[in-house]
C-alpha cells in the first residue's frame, strides 16, 4: 500500500464557487398542481443553483481556485499540494484533479 506524507502543511484558504442562476423548485414544469409544494416540504429543497449548458464542476473549481490565489496574492507555482473535492466527475480520464493541477503549470 502506498502512503503520502507531506510535512509542514497549513491551510491558508478555502474557496467554493456556485453558479449565479437560481431555479425555484416550485416553478419547475415537471410537477403537477400541488406536487411541488409537497416535494419541497419533504426535502427542504426550495431552490437550486444552475450552471449554463456546457459548464462543468471543473469550470467552477477553476474559478474558485483563481479567486483564492488572487485573494491570497499567491503565484500558481508556489502551490505544493492541491486538494480537489467533488461529488461529480466531468471526464472519465483524466480526472478533474489532474486537469486542475495542469492548470497550475
Segments from the language model and where they lie:
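Conserved "HGTGT" condensation-loop signature of ketosynthase/thiolase-family condensing enzymes
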Residues: 1-83, 102-105
Amino acid at each position: 500500500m502506498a502512503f503520502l506524507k507531506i510535512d509542514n502543511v497549513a491551510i491558508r484558504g478555502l474557496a467554493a464557487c456556485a453558479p449565479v442562476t437560481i431555479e425555484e423548485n416550485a416553478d419547475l414544469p415537471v410537477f403537477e398542481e400541488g406536487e411541488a409544494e409537497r416535494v419541497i416540504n419533504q426535502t427542504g429543497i426550495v431552490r437550486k443553483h444552475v450552471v449554463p449548458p456546457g459548464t462543468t464542476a471543473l469550470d467552477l473549481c477553476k474559478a474558485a481556485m483563481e479567486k483564492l490565489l488572487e485573494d491570497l496574492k499567491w503565484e500558481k507555482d508556489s502551490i505544493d499540494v492541491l486538494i480537489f473535492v467533488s461529488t461529480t466527475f466531468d471526464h472519465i480520464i483524466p480526472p478533474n484533479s489532474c486537469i486542475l493541477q495542469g492548470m497550475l503549470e
